[in-house]
Amino acid sequence: MIALCHWEPNGVFLKPLIALAEKGAPYNSHWFDPTAFEQFAPGFPANAESALQLEREGPLLVVGGEVLSSTSFQLEYLNEAVAGPDLFPVTAHDRYRVRAWAQYLGLGLGPVVSALGCARFLRPVLAARDGGALRAQLAAIEPLERRHAWLAVLDGAVDEAAWQQRLAVPVARLEKALTGADWLAGPAYSLADIDAYALVAPLRTLAPAVVNAVTTPHLAGWLARIDERPAVRAALALSRSGQPEAAWVPGTEPSRWG
């Protein structure tokens, strides 16, 4: 049976939870708290790919002893490997659009949402801990870029205003794509919508002036349609804290190319 190592249903952690709920598939849930660095504990599933994945602390699928990381790949795997509704579009062009959106939003929106979430919610959590012990834990994190991402949160080295500005282009692109269309990749709800929803929905809390019914009416309508899906409600109901929107860890490294 598929095992899913996951945390609160928010951000990238939400994606496979929605997909599994849409499929109605049984799986073994392995909850871990990345803010307690449980992902670095001996015996935690890992391989070369998971250690270097762009999403850093994201969820892992374990299938037959193999570890699958990176949530856009996980979504495609689950769609093909698990019985249930087909969430991949029919046409080649719409399938291309699923992958194009995943790449664009993963690199263009994922880092922004993660940075804003960490600045607002994770930094106070880290600041309340013993500084010496915490820095000793962070010093052991490899690779260096992964360690620096945690240190940036702890040290408050996040320019929230600059990150807010970086929302403009991807949000405008989404709003334009949803003008006259219900879904992102063809006439039906698909993996593209699951992938994007997990990154866009938190902006209602993190950047309400950017994503709202007045400024982005088509995007707001799309979010509302997905909010109502039983699978999405079921995934969100898995929260242990009752506040999944406050659950953030450093995510995808920002693009080096702007």
Q: For the regions a protein language model found, what residue spans apply to each?
A:
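GST-like domain detector, emphasizing the conserved glutathione-binding G-site
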Residues: M1-I141, E253-P254
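C-terminal or late-domain output modules
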Residues: A3-E8, L14, K23, W31, ...
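Non-transmembrane alpha-helical segments in soluble domains
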Residues: L17, L75, N79, R99-A102, ...
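A general structural signal marking secondary-structure boundaries and capping sites
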Residues: V82, L178-A181, P230, S239
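A short, terminal or domain-edge coil/loop segment
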Residues: D86-R95, I141-L154, A234-P250
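Short flexible/disordered coil segments
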Residues: R97-A100, P124-D130, L174-L178, D182, ...
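GST-like fold's C-terminal all-alpha helical module
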Residues: L109-G221
